[in-house]
């Protein structure tokens, strides 16, 4: 099992690499790539940790060596949000980065599962899909926008609010990965009573705006890196388990049946070839139905911006 992390010298990338070095199955290899010259040193640093995971680091303008033979590719390359920036502000810089890296994925490891972390995820996944399609290697079962951080936040905030063990809270978060497109299905949380619709609305808004909470708290020093790394590691390890035959369910931003939008975050069952089954959303509350319908124009616009970046 070979996992490649592109953008491995950044705040998310280094933390993600550490988590994978500690948690990948014995005999795995971890390949780190970044334009930053420090990247081989990050790999050397990690290589001193005694786990049976081999780490290599590559720097420069070409990620080809890092990608050769990769089974899973995680892309966190690009610029991070700063105070006052929206995820859409990131588009201009990050779109070109995702395009060029995905072109290399298509060349070097066309059958790999690809997880996009770089924001704005709603659009970046569409860019990656169109690049892979142009290269003739697109398999919609194997391309994911990693929205797991929305789930981690929802689990944490629900547990704080209701005095629960956060490791025992499970909740699907659907839609997309920015602002109003993030929709936690609070009505589906087991063994929790909501005191009012106001409580649900307030918690939904907190989950939707949690990224901004971190950006502001870091006071210009970055965005959510450590929690995002944990989210990406959780999703990557789910892919690893699924590749070994386990039946794993996670939410991810994927191309499904197109009922709501071409790409949509929903629960999926993972298998040896990526998505094995697209699961239903279950019963939604009236508030959730309304919020779902209200987000679609924004989500579809985000997707179109990604498609148009490649197709003109």
Curated annotation (Swiss-Prot):
Biological process terms in GO annotation: malate metabolic process; tricarboxylic acid cycle
Catalytic-site annotation from UniProt: 177
Catalytic activity: (S)-malate + NAD(+) = oxaloacetate + NADH + H(+)
Binding site for substrate: 81, 87, 119, 153
EC number: 1.1.1.37
Pfam families: Ldh_1_C, Ldh_1_N
Keywords: NAD, Oxidoreductase, Tricarboxylic acid cycle
Top enzyme class: oxidoreductase
Entry annotated with the keyword Nuclease: no
Family assignment from sequence similarity: Belongs to the LDH/MDH superfamily. MDH type 1 family.
Name of the molecule in the record: Malate dehydrogenase
Species in which this protein is naturally found: Mannheimia succiniciproducens (strain KCTC 0769BP / MBEL55E)
Organismal lineage: Bacteria, Pseudomonadati, Pseudomonadota, Gammaproteobacteria, Pasteurellales
Gene: mdh
């Amino acid at each position: 099992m070979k996992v490649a992390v592109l953008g491995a010298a950044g705040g998310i990338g280094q933390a993600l690499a550490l988590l994978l070095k500690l948690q990948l199955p014995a005999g795995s290899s971890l390949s780190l790539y970044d334009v930053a010259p420090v990247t081989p040193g990050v790999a050397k640093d990690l290589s001193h940790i005694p786990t049976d995971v081999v780490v290599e680091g590559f720097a420069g303008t070409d990620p080809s060596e890092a990608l050769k033979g990769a089974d899973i590719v995680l892309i966190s390359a690009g610029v991070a949000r700063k105070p006052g920036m929206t995820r859409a502000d990131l588009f201009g810089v990050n779109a070109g980065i995702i395009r060029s890296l995905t072109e290399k994925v298509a060349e070097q490891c066309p059958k790999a599962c690809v997880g996009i972390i770089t924001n704005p995820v709603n659009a970046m996944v569409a860019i990656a899909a169109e690049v892979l399609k142009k290269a003739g290697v697109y398999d919609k079962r194997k391309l994911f926008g990693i929205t797991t951080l929305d789930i981690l936040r929802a689990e944490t905030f629900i547990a704080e609010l209701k005095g629960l063990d956060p490791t025992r809270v499970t909740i699907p978060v659907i839609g997309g990965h920015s602002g109003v497109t993030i929709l936690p299905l609070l009505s589906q949380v087991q063994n929790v009573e909501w005191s009012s619709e106001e409580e649900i609305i307030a918690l939904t808004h907190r989950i939707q705006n949690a990224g901004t909470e971190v950006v502001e708290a870091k006071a210009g020093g970055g965005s959510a890196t450590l929690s995002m790394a944990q989210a990406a590691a959780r999703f990557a390890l789910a892919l690893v388990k699924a590749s070994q035959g386990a039946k794993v369910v996670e939410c991810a931003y994927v191309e499904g049946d197109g009922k709501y939008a071409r790409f949509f975050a929903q629960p999926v069952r993972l298998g040896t070839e990526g998505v094995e089954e697209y699961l239903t959303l279950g019963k939604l509350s009236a508030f959730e139905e309304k919020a779902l319908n209200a987000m679609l124009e924004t989500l579809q616009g985000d997707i179109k911006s990604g498609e148009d970046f490649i197709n003109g």
